[in-house]
């Protein structure tokens, strides 16, 4: 069966990580054929440089070369990765004007951060694509899918624009999924994510009219911020809707983040029972999505971990009054770049398989 043709709109941090995840998973050219990447620049040499040298993730295991799409091209505008050719296309303010139809693209991975509204993302469909996967939380009624949690809800006939949620939701939702599936329940919960700084932040104090604290220097401050990640869990696990909220602290690390969930269970339980349930899930129905560690690890130990969420059993706490057994804290790590990017790839592969089985592709 021929690979599904994919286009990536936005070849920044996440766009590149998604592409590199395909290479690492050995699905480029077999299951997925990335025919084009879209960005403000079409300089293949610069893209190749970015892929070859990464401060956090290191050198790739695959070959990266460049070529020209035609003899008349002034500079190389084609990436050649393990022999696969990927055209570099100039970005357009209107996704409907991108040449997806001409290029035969089936799926667009929308990773610019600009077209997260469903109506705007549908421009890619007008441009000739069949489906759009947004690598961010979405608005406007786009279906939100978290792999390992609610992918079974995907409907090929009606879900043409799908959101992969946020990296933090992808970490929190698997933990909550196990707690609810194994009948611990969540009466109410507060989440904090200790989150590495990202490209949207400032290297030195700068202008940030809407978020004053967010404009402060990322590498030397702990910066309180907002996040909708906890509330978004209610979109993929309806039984928790309205029961979870949270906040974020941006901290001076370049990658890997950690979720701290304090919750009240709906029944009496214990740390030992919670540990056992999460460990079993990590080895069975959540394998590859949820991890489990009982080692004395720190954030850098999770760099390049492709799982969405790694439960830290050493960090689990309880604070119950006499006669109570329902108040707990659980902690889970995640590589907010690498793990999340792998889930984008997994989602595209999952949707592609479902679409083909239902003859939507």
UniProtKB/Swiss-Prot annotation:
The record marks 195 as: Activates thiol group during catalysis. InterPro entries: GlycerAld/Erythrose_P_DH (IPR020831), GlycerAld_3-P_DH_AS (IPR020830), GlycerAld_3-P_DH_cat (IPR020829), GlycerAld_3-P_DH_NAD(P)-bd (IPR020828), Glyceraldehyde-3-P_DH_1 (IPR006424), NAD(P)-bd_dom_sf (IPR036291). Pathway: Carbohydrate degradation; glycolysis; pyruvate from D-glyceraldehyde 3-phosphate: step 1/5. One of its GO terms (molecular function) is NAD binding. Its EC number is 1.2.1.12. One of its GO terms (cellular component) is glycosome. D-glyceraldehyde 3-phosphate binds at residues 166-168, 198, 227-228, 250. SUPFAM superfamilies: Glyceraldehyde-3-phosphate dehydrogenase-like, C-terminal domain, NAD(P)-binding Rossmann-fold domains. The active site is at residue 167. SMART domains: Gp_dh_N (SM00846). It is found in: Glycosome. It catalyses: D-glyceraldehyde 3-phosphate + phosphate + NAD(+) = (2R)-3-phospho-glyceroyl phosphate + NADH + H(+). Homotetramer. NCBIfam families: GAPDH-I. Belongs to the glyceraldehyde-3-phosphate dehydrogenase family. This is Glyceraldehyde-3-phosphate dehydrogenase, glycosomal. It comes from Crithidia fasciculata. The gene is GAPDG.
């Amino acid at each position: 069966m021929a690979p599904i043709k994919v286009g990536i709109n936005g070849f920044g941090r996440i766009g590149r990580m998604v592409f590199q995840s395909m290479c690492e998973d050995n699905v480029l050219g077999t299951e997925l054929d990335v025919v084009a990447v879209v960005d403000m620049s079409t300089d293949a040499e610069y893209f190749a440089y970015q892929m070859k040298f990464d401060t956090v993730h290191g050198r790739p295991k695959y070959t990266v070369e460049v070529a020209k799409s035609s003899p008349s091209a002034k500079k190389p505008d084609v990436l050649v990765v393990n022999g696969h050719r990927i055209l570099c296309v100039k970005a357009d303010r209107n996704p409907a004007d991108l040449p997806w139809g001409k290029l035969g693209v089936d799926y667009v991975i929308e990773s610019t951060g600009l077209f997260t509204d469903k109506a705007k993302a549908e421009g890619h469909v007008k441009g000739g694509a069949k489906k759009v996967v947004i690598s961010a939380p979405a608005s406007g009624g786009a279906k939100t899918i978290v792999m390992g949690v609610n992918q079974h809800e995907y409907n090929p006939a009606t879900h043409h624009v799908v959101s992969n949620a946020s990296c933090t939701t992808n970490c929190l939702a698997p933990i909550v999924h196990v707690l609810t599936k194994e009948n611990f329940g969540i009466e109410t919960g507060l989440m904090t994510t200790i989150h590495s700084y990202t490209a949207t932040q400032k290297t030195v104090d700068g202008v940030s009219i809407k978020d004053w604290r967010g404009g402060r220097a990322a590498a030397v401050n702990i910066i309180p911020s907002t996040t909708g990640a906890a509330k978004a869990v209610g979109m993929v696990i309806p039984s928790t809707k309205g029961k979870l909220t949270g906040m974020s602290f941006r901290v001076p690390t370049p990658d890997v983040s950690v979720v701290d969930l304090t919750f009240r269970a709906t029944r009496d339980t214990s740390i030992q029972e919670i540990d056992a349930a999460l460990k079993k899930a990590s080895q069975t129905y959540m394998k590859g999505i949820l991890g489990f560690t009982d080692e004395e690890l720190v954030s850098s130990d999770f760099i390049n971990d492709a799982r969405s969420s790694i439960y830290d059993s050493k960090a689990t706490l309880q604070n119950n009054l006499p006669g109570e057994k329902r108040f707990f804290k659980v902690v889970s790590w995640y590589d907010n770049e690498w793990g999340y990017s792998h889930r984008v790839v997994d989602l595209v592969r999952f949707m592609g398989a479902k679409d083909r089985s239902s003859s939507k592709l």
